Amino acid sequence: MKLTAIAVMPMLLAACTKDEVNPTPTNGGKEGEIELILKNESVADGTRAFGSGTTESWEKSISSAVLIVYNTSGTQILRRVLTAAEVNGSTTTPIKFVLPGVSADASCDFYVVINRNIADNITTKAKLLEELESDIASYNGTYANVTTKAMRSGGFVMTGATTAKIAAGTTAVTMTVKRVVAKVEIQTSMTDSFRTKYGNGCVEVKKVTLSRGAEKSFLIDQTTSKYATVSSSFTSAQDAYCDKTGASKTNAYKYNNLFYINEKAAAATGSRIKVVLNAVYDADGNLSTTTDQLAVTYETELTGATGGKIARNGSYKVNAKLDGLTGQDVTLAVTVANWDALSTQDVNLGQ
């Protein structure tokens, strides 16, 4: 998703209409007109292959947006709240407003926040950078829900930031906007090795739980220098969805889960995001009979792209491959997908 703002100088409009959000200032002809275009590809809702890292329509839907501009001292010089109608129509009808008191060669910091309110008392860049996102739980829910709609009211929060020097003529500002959360898809299946060992026996995954996730993250990406100092106590559990597509036996079933989590810095083994699979082993592969079932648990960690690092707007596919029943033997291969780029992690579980 791209957001483009174009500043045109000198001023082309003599005055603003009385209902304009930001009145035209009188400051010696240093005003600039901003022409804002929000670009967001429109795709129809539909079924897709699980684990492809595709960005769904509800994951990039825009309901509201705000543009905030700061001068070099970090003081807010413009805030423009955009309505849903303005945002959705901006590709054909650019949004125009005034950037006051800016001379050529001056540098300005541009920030865009989508699908989230910014309090009126946040009037400096420093205060905006202190803002935290703390509602990660609201993104998660049942598999049926998270794979068909945005669970968070208002949609996925997205932000972008860039610095631009104002030119004497037209200043074009291009900004990349990213979701503040990461996406994790987990698919569990039994391997040929499992079927060789246990014949018709199968494992039915009941629930998958992620834990040790970051409770909060900064609203504005600052990961080049720091992460929000928060606890790693976020936990989310979800019943597994059984995918029987193309399966002739229960030991060929696949089990799917999807979570959204906050960014998290790379960490040593034992401190990364933990994945727990709660399942039952069925000796004869007939899941309708329970006398031959045994509870089993598998544990592993998310490797992220590398070292357990989870990036905002990152997409991670975990292939959990069950080789046995002990839950001790774990091998992971992660694919990082875009959203930014799909990262896949394969993990072999059991012996």
Where do the model's predicted regions map?
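Bacterial N-terminal signal peptides that target proteins for export
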Residues: 1-5
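Residue-level signal for mature regions of secreted extracellular proteins and peptides
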Residues: 9-10
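A short, Gly/Thr-enriched small/hydrophobic beta-strand-prone motif that recurs across taxa
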Residues: 22-48, 178-192
